[in-house]
């Protein structure tokens, strides 16, 4: 989800800067402008960027906890990182794959009809991204694991600690 979201965003951004279609809203008699100047395209691109960067940040945080849990000396820091990682895995997996798919969908929207054609990579990105929400336990199964098991670990203290960290 993370890599495809970022790739889809970069492709859509480049296309929106290059593709000219329609005049600006401020002057309907003007020549066609790059579609990045149209409000709906800009809104889609901003949403795509936010989701792409959000998935990257969340994944980086999980990677940090993975590194600490694997390489720190045994002790509280290592245990805390392992606990955080255990809790974050289903969250990162579901969020990244769901938002990655949404970014790919929005990229197709930015491309318009061309986005649905195989000549442009966003069509393939969307198909590739969808399978990531199914592999390694569907996102629904991951959610059940989070709610049914991981949020209850250590009497719920692990989850509440994570919530406090986010606040």
Q: Where on the chain are the PLM-derived regions?
A:
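Flavin-dependent oxidoreductase catalytic core characteristic
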Residues: 1-167
């Amino acid at each position: 989800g993370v890599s495809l979201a970022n790739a889809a965003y970069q492709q859509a951004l480049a296309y929106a800067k290059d593709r000219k279609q329609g005049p600006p809203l401020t002057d309907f008699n003007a020549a066609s402008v790059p579609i990045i100047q149209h409000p709906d395209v800009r809104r889609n691109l901003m949403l795509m960027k936010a989701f792409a960067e959000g998935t990257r940040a969340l994944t980086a945080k999980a990677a940090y906890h993975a590194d600490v849990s694997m390489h720190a000396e045994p002790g509280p820091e290592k245990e805390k990182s392992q606990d955080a990682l255990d809790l974050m895995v289903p969250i990162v997996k579901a969020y990244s794959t769901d938002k990655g798919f949404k970014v790919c969908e929005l990229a197709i929207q930015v491309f318009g009809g061309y986005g649905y054609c195989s000549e442009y990579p966003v069509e393939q990105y969307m198909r590739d991204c969808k399978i990531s929400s199914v592999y390694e336990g569907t996102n629904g199964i991951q959610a059940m694991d989070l709610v049914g098991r991981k949020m209850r670990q250590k009497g719920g203290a692990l989850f509440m600690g994570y919530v406090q960290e986010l606040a």
